[in-house]
């Protein structure tokens, strides 16, 4: 493989400890109509300068962000404190906070773009598909000590991609219709030219070469334009997991963050022990993403390079048992145990469909139910 010029080398900050951070996207909905409200700029202006609340592509969205946290409990407490402030301001303006992978009935054509050069450039390039990005998600950062670990961890973590997506799937509806998918968001987001599954590089120089080529050919100008579902975040010294659909409540989010933290730290420790991390062929990884997006917790997933298959919930049972010692060491055993409650009582996409069925297909009731789940 060709080496990259010294000017194209990418420094990875590195994290001395396996810290965790969370970015949680929320839509603003009108308290009466339950449709989206393009008032994020006024909400953010009233909150004032803070690293904990960010603007996003669309003016109907605010993103709540933690600081650098030692464990899941600390991250959830951080989010809780910020959300109390944000929700008070939002409610004072006649709106509510809403989180799911998609809004059940909102139409993309009425949504306003946030005024920022990078968003304008995104839409200029991606056109219709870019304007369709009426989606919300959760991003989890986990600290990694050294660049040489990053790509092996990302490539191996793809084996658990369908588990993470199926558990968080919350976007069955699009523009008033049931799509038949558990996560329509996952299918939508990958239409952007630099989004979707990451390439399964095994070394940092391979990633550096990729970024060099992307910049040289004008595909990207900045690192943050690589919008992979799992990607390195060199300036933070983290791996950023962007698989999740939007999550409607803190308890469920805590379980998903704990699972993510444990998975990454487990892979990190196995690397330290000299293990070669397992990977699957990219065609299996791609198929698993589709199966999880389509069938959610009913997906039968591919487990390994030998093409063995298993129901995702059965594999989750064993995975949670295996990760218990890691969870205890990360002080998130209780949150990890909550993962099983998601598939025992129903993921968000299943709950949404139940509400719609109980209300004769009324999607306003679905929005009501999702808003009510955010208990602070």
Swiss-Prot record:
GO terms for biological process: modified amino acid biosynthetic process. It comes from the Bacteria. Keywords: ATP-binding, Ligase, Nucleotide-binding. Its EC number is 6.3.2.2. SUPFAM superfamilies: Glutamine synthetase/guanido kinase (SSF55931). It catalyses: L-cysteine + L-glutamate + ATP = gamma-L-glutamyl-L-cysteine + ADP + phosphate + H(+). The keyword ATP-binding applies. GO terms for molecular function: ATP binding; glutamate-cysteine ligase activity. The keyword ATP-binding applies. It is an enzyme of class 6 (ligase). Belongs to the glutamate--cysteine ligase type 2 family. YbdK subfamily. HAMAP family: Glu_cys_ligase_2 (MF_01609). NCBIfam families: gshA_cyan_rel (TIGR02050), PRK13517.1-2 (NF010042), PRK13517.1-3 (NF010043), PRK13517.1-4 (NF010044). ATP-dependent carboxylate-amine ligase which exhibits weak glutamate--cysteine ligase activity. This is Putative glutamate--cysteine ligase 2-1.
């Amino acid at each position: 493989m060709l080496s990259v010029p010294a000017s194209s080398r990418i420094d990875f900050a590195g994290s001395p400890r396996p810290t965790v951070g969370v970015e949680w996207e929320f839509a603003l909905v009108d308290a009466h109509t339950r449709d989206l409200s393009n008032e994020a700029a006024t909400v953010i202006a009233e909150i004032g300068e803070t690293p904990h609340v960010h603007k996003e592509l669309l003016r109907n969205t605010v993103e709540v962000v933690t600081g650098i946290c030692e464990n899941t409990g600390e991250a959830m407490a951080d989010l809780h404190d910020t959300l109390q402030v944000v929700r008070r301001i939002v409610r004072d303006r006649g709106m509510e906070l809403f989180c799911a992978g998609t809004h059940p009935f909102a139409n993309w054509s009425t949504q306003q773009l946030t005024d920022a050069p990078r968003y304008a450039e995104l839409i200029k390039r991606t056109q219709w598909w870019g304007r369709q990005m009426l989606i919300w998600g959760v991003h989890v950062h986990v600290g990694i000590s050294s660049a040489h670990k990053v790509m092996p961890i990302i490539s191996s973590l793809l084996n658990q991609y369908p588990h993470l997506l199926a558990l968080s799937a919350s976007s069955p509806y699009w523009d008033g219709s049931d799509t038949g998918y558990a996560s329509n968001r996952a299918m939508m987001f990958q239409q952007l030219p630099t989004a979707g599954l990451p390439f399964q590089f095994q070394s940092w120089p391979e990633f550096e070469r990729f970024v060099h080529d992307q910049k040289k050919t004008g595909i990207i100008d900045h690192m943050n334009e690589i919008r992979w579902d799992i990607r390195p975040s060199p300036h933070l010294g983290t791996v950023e997991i962007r698989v999740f659909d939007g999550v409607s409540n803190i308890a469920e989010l805590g379980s998903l963050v704990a699972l993510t933290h444990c998975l990454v730290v487990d892979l990190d420790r196995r690397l330290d022990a000299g293990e070669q991390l397992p990977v699957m062929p990219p065609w299996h990884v791609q198929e698993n993403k589709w199966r999880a997006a389509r069938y959610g917790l009913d997906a039968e997933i591919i487990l390994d390079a030998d093409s063995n298959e298993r129901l995702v919930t059965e594999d989750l049972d064993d995975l949670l048992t295996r990760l218990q010692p890691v969870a205890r060491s990360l002080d998130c055993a209780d949150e990890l145990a909550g993962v099983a409650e998601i598939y025992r009582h129903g993921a968000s996409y299943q709950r949404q469909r139940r509400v719609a069925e109980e209300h004769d297909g009324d999607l306003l009731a679905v929005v009501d139910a999702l808003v009510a789940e955010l208990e602070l």
